[in-house]
Swiss-Prot record:
A GO term for molecular function: RNA polymerase binding
Gene assigned in the entry: greA
SUPFAM superfamilies reported in the protein's UniProt record: FKBP-like, GreA transcript cleavage protein, N-terminal domain
Full protein name: Transcription elongation factor GreA
Family: Belongs to the GreA/GreB family.
Amino acid sequence: MQRVPMTKGGLVRLKDELRRLKSVERPKIVKEIAEARAHGDLSENAEYHAAKEKQSHIEGRIAQVEHWIASAEVIDVTKHAGDRVVFGATVSLEDAESGDQVTYRIVGELEADLKQGKISVTSPIARALIGRSEGDTVVVRSPGGEKEYEIQSVAFVEEELPTESE
């Protein structure tokens, strides 16, 4: 089994999703199937077929999340130190052209969320940053062209772990 690098927070979110799927979504769909089945003839029962399709989707998602959890390799970012960019680092950059500042945290593919400033370790920006240090200038090659950044800072901080979902 190929190991999937992940932060502690990413693993917590996956476990929370699995708990929600098993304890909320699965029982809810079982109830919907039972109610639809009570309406009679299953061959022409659109509610029943829709509920069974939804159940299949939920069971598939449960299997997928269980696989991700089983193959997770949790990287403790607090064990890193120094100014070299590695998985889990929070990196502040300055756009060499515009002077704009941006901060990214390098995470596993399953955790990436640009809106939260989390970029995949396999993204063009992360690939350009890995192994570099504070003060280095990096050129990021992406489908949109080349962009130059200067690494302002590299930090290794534990992200705030998510709380249990509602």
